[in-house]
Amino acid sequence: MSANNYLFSGSIVAIVTPMDSSGEIDFVRLKSLVEHHIAAGTDAIVSVGTTGEAATLSIDENVKTILKTVEFADGRIPVIAGAGANATSEAIVMTKLLNDSGVAGCLSVVPYYNKPTQEGMYQHFKAIAECTDLPQILYNVPSRTGSDLLPETVARLAKINNIVAIKEATGDLSRVAKIKELAGEDFIFLSGDDATGLESIKLGGQGVISVTNNVAAADMAKMCHLALNGQFEEAEQINQRLMALHKNLFVESNPIPVKWAAYRLGLIDTPTLRLPLTTLSEHLQPKVEDALKIAGLL
């Protein structure tokens, strides 16, 4: 199946949620970010995922931010809603609120902190999928959740009609072939790890849900599109230029560094985050700035 035949593929930005200095959401800047990504060739936007600070926004703020993003996109770029929670009932409430929102799908994270079994994860995602017709993207990020959604469980979930994809953020490249083997070639594999994103496409993945895209949107779009067309050498040249960013945007917990980088580039007005996250430590700012320079962004 070609990349164009997949519902989700290419360079997908896990977009930051811009805030003013008091921590209120800056919807004017959010609109400008959406325009920026459309102009740069980004293939889709994930609204209020990990990078969008979903964990420190209220449900009302989450929904409002998603709806505003859909409004600003105006049908020109698909918007995927972060709709996960570690309580299945809460995730269902959030998902139902989005049923008629115009989103292209929902990204639902493995429940965090309470560490369910594989059967618990299966039942969690099954219950969410059954409450909606919206396409569902599973989100596996064990470094944050404390639990790993195994390929065998993904394969079980892939049998549910509207569970169509996974965002795999383990960085384990063997997962691409394993998930494709068990879940089928039609099941969409999206890397959630910028540093191994290109390699995952080479191995049969469909794209990257990217943090780096926030500050290097045009480069990430070009890299992903080249790779999906089999032009790996040209894609690798871009990837090498971005590699310092892929790594240094995680010198502190995401989205701390990427918000500072977006601020440094003038894409947002402040690097403000909601507590308990605080602005990038001063001694690490030169590392991120150097990565921006290596990428040719400064």
From Swiss-Prot:
Pfam families for the chain: DHDPS
Domain of life of the organism encoding this protein: Bacteria
Disulfide bonds: none
Alphabetical keyword list: Amino-acid biosynthesis, Cytoplasm, Diaminopimelate biosynthesis, Lyase, Lysine biosynthesis, Schiff base
Gene Ontology terms: cellular component: cytosol
Cross-referenced InterPro entries: Aldolase_TIM, DapA, DapA-like, Schiff_base-form_aldolases_AS, Schiff_base-form_aldolases_CS
EC number: 4.3.3.7
Marked site (Part of a proton relay during catalysis) residue numbers: T50, Y113
Pathway: Amino-acid biosynthesis; L-lysine biosynthesis via DAP pathway; (S)-tetrahydrodipicolinate from L-aspartate: step 3/4
KW Manganese (keyword) present: no
CDD domains associated with the record: DHDPS
Binding annotation for pyruvate: T51, I209
Catalytic activity: L-aspartate 4-semialdehyde + pyruvate = (2S,4S)-4-hydroxy-2,3,4,5-tetrahydrodipicolinate + H2O + H(+)
GO molecular function: 4-hydroxy-tetrahydrodipicolinate synthase activity
Active site: Y139 (proton donor/acceptor), K167 (schiff-base intermediate with substrate)
Primary residence: cytoplasm
Alphabetical GO biological process terms: diaminopimelate biosynthetic process; lysine biosynthetic process via diaminopimelate
Intracellular or extracellular location(s): Cytoplasm
Family: Belongs to the DapA family.
The protein's assembly and partners: Homotetramer; dimer of dimers.
Function statement: Catalyzes the condensation of (S)-aspartate-beta-semialdehyde [(S)-ASA] and pyruvate to 4-hydroxy-tetrahydrodipicolinate (HTPA).
Designated name of the protein: 4-hydroxy-tetrahydrodipicolinate synthase
